[in-house]
Amino acid sequence: MTIKISICTSVKIFNNNLCLLILPLLFVLTGFNSLLQAQDRNYEDVIIMGVYAHPDDETSSGPVFAKYARKGAQIVLVVATDGRLGVTDLTDLEAGDELAELRREEMQCAADVLGADLHHMRYHDQLRAPEGQDLFIQESRKIIDELHEIMGEWQPNVIITWGPDGGSNHLDHRIISATVTQVVLSKDWEQRPSLFYSGTQIPDLGELWKYRGVHEDFLTVRESFSEEDVDVAAEAARCHSSQFGPDLIDSWAEQWRHRGHFYFRPFEAPRAKADDLLNYPSQYE
């Protein structure tokens, strides 16, 4: 009865019989009921969408996608570019159509391993920015149009993408982060999805913290996963053999197993309306 007494005392309910009647309501109000419901959730009704720039970017959250696929959720991966500029020492291919075709095959392989549906757009890396600003803007708007259609078709419950840092400050990553945010902000949703940005805590980045780090106060979602999920994610990453060598993937898998979780920053919906910037309630109070 210790729990009952401590709860009742905290709300100044000293009659034991009355406390027993009110306790169920207290559990609802304090979120215990929600937690119990979450344990019994039917994940088959859940759609989780990852939106990325390149084939292989999904590896950044691979264990998370593997986790929810294992639970029965539908995973949808959306990849904007064909990866034609992803030249490495792992193949003899130069930038261009042949490399793009190989990377499309690799991306399909990874999606199959993760148990995900795949929408692979065919935009050029950098959205043809080297060819001029006007063409870049045209390509950027085409992606927005296409994402509106894809997201409207799937109506995802959750969307995961890069944060404004792009993970590695990559131009394409940052463009996709901004593009996904724009679609979520502008679309008239039947049910607005929860948007999450991948993030890395500052202590994990050393001297790179200023360019890629996210303060822990913003990384409020700590998503855990199992060793089984790591195994699936590593197998999916091995599909991208033109980009990652086996030793690198093994090192990632070891890090994932040791850490056991990833951090995400939620895109927070407005909490109030105001007619003055200084009158808007601070989210940090």
Which residues fall in each region the model found?
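Short intrinsically disordered, low-complexity coil segments enriched in acidic
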Residues: T2-I3, L26-L29, R271-A274
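The feature marks non-catalytic terminal segments
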Residues: K187-E285
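Bacterial N-terminal signal peptides
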Residues: C19-G31
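Active-site beta-strand->loop->alpha-helix modules in alpha/beta enzyme cores, enriched
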Residues: L35-E190, Q283
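N-terminal secretory signal peptides that target proteins for export/translocation
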Residues: M1-N15
